[in-house]
Design a protein with these regions (language model features):
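Sec/Tat signal peptide C-region and signal peptidase I cleavage site
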Residues: 22-27
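Bacterial N-terminal signal peptides
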Residues: 9-20
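N-terminal secretory signal peptides that target proteins for export/translocation
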Residues: 1-5
Length: 446
């Protein structure tokens, strides 16, 4: 081993040791093993805090009180959400700069840090905010998205093809099979949460929404509906409660006054989490049911594997020059849930529910090189600001980090080295998890 390599490894190990000593115990992130160095990270980031996707007119139809207004259009990242993602970007620089992956105190080498975002305003502005937080004085950082805005980006929103038909009726049937053929069990299991939600949406026994609909969709029969592209959603009390609960979470993260968060009818975060358990259940059904996860997540997961093998495989990246070392893929909670389902992943950040894809949260795939053997390994981690950090707009640092959790990869349990999965094993797991017919050329090859 050359003196330069030995020096680099020693420096990286020293930084990792310092980081481990400075990072609070609750962070639960493993240090870089001695003799290893981090080589690449692919970070699948959810967009930050946004306004409700539905209009107030649509939401008001099913609530007894008009919903509060946001300073942006429906579905847009709010200014507060943008600020919070800049704070997260600052922490990414501290985290990955401290590990020696990227520059910590200067602009990155051209091409080594890049972001690819979905087409929505909330994803594009999230990507820009993260990069601005990482390197506020650096210009021309690669922030790209698909040039054609008239069709969905197949990385984040794959569309039906001959080899991946995404049949709506089949997806409906798969969801109903997980429900045991009817909603009876689900409605029974979530009866207390639905009653709680009904008291928030429709206090004093209100039966009509201000927009004229059935308050809380209480009188609407539960059903699974699918669109022409195979997307499924739930109608009825569970579906509307899921939407409402996530909107309450966004209100709280936005720092709205307590009398505006769920109209002041939720006293504690524990109550909010009770309501969010409905949202988690609905997301599990609509995003984690196996055929749906394979249809929606195979392209993205294959792309992650391709980027780890070759940093030039990052979307929009030139075939010449430096490979990407830190690549941000900015999408949606559905993308994270799809990948979590394919790899059987779970995590829990303090204050959130297990496996919650929180606003601005990220699932990271981190690749390490064992310098002495030349072998490569992959670890997974989840990073997210806690709800309290978002409400306080808390600056993030080694001493005051966001929530973070090492994420186990069950399929690699027998092959782990230093709690990391050998790259070749990880790639085999990815290939076994995806549906080949749902992987397009845009996902790269390895």
């Amino acid at each position: 081993m050359s003196l330069r390599v030995r020096t680099a490894v020693f420096a990286a190990s020293l930084v990792a040791s310092v980081v481990a000593m400075m990072t609070p115990v609750h962070a639960q992130i493993l240090p870089t093993p001695p003799g290893w160095q981090i080589e690449r990270a692919v970070v699948l980031n959810r967009h930050g805090v946004r306004a409700p996707i539905a209009t107030n007119e649509q939401l008001d139809r099913y609530s007894a009180t008009a919903w509060p207004t946001w300073p942006v259009e429906p579905g847009f990242l709010s200014p507060r959400g943008e600020e919070l993602m800049r704070l997260m970007g600052t922490y990414y620089r501290v985290l990955y700069g401290g590990r020696g992956l990227i520059q910590a105190d200067d602009c990155p080498t051209a091409g080594t840090v890049a972001a690819w975002t979905d087409l929505d305003q909330r994803t594009r502005v999230t990507g820009a905010a993260i990069l601005a937080g990482m390197y506020p004085r650096c210009a021309n950082l690669p922030l790209r998205n698909q040039a054609n805005f008239t069709v969905p980006d197949p990385i984040f929103h794959p569309q039906p093809t001959a080899s991946c038909p995404m049949n709506g009726a089949a997806n409906q049937a798969a969801v109903m099979a997980r429900l045991g053929g009817s909603f009876a069990s689900a409605l029974r299991n979530y009866a207390s949460q639905l009653t709680m939600m009904q008291s928030v949406l429709c206090p004093a026994g209100a039966t009509k929404g201000v927009g004229g609909g059935s308050c809380g969709e209480a009188g609407v029969a539960s059903s699974v509906v699918a669109d022409a592209d195979g997307w499924v959603r739930l109608r009825g009390p569970l579906g509307y409660a899921s939407t409402a609960a996530e909107n309450f979470l966004m209100q709280s993260a936005e720092g709205m006054p307590k009398d505006q968060v769920a109209w002041g009818r939720i006293a504690h975060d524990a109550t909010l989490n009770e309501l969010l358990s409905i949202h988690q259940f609905v997301q599990d059904l609509t995003q984690k049911t196996k055929p749906i996860a394979q249809q929606r997540g195979s392209n993205l997961l294959s792309l992650v594997g391709a980027i780890l093998v070759n940093g030039h495989s990052f979307p929009g990246h030139a075939a010449t020059g430096q490979p990407v070392r830190l690549g941000l893929l900015v999408g949606h909670q559905s993308n994270i849930h799809n990948i979590a389902a394919l790899l059987d992943l779970t995590w829990q950040i303090p204050g959130y529910l297990p496996a919650e894809a929180s606003p601005g949260g990220a699932l990271a795939f981190e690749q390490f090189l064992d310098v002495s053997t030349g072998r490569r390994y992959v670890r997974l981690a989840y990073y997210a600001q806690t709800l309290d950090e978002m409400r306080r707009r808390a600056p993030l640092s080694y001493r005051d980090p966001p929530g973070m959790k090492q994420v186990a990869l069950p399929a690699c349990a027998a092959d782990l080295v230093n709690d990391a999965c050998p790259l070749e094993s990880f790639l085999k797991i990815v290939k076994a998890a995806v549906e080949p017919g749902c992987v397009t050329s845009s996902a790269g090859n390895y």
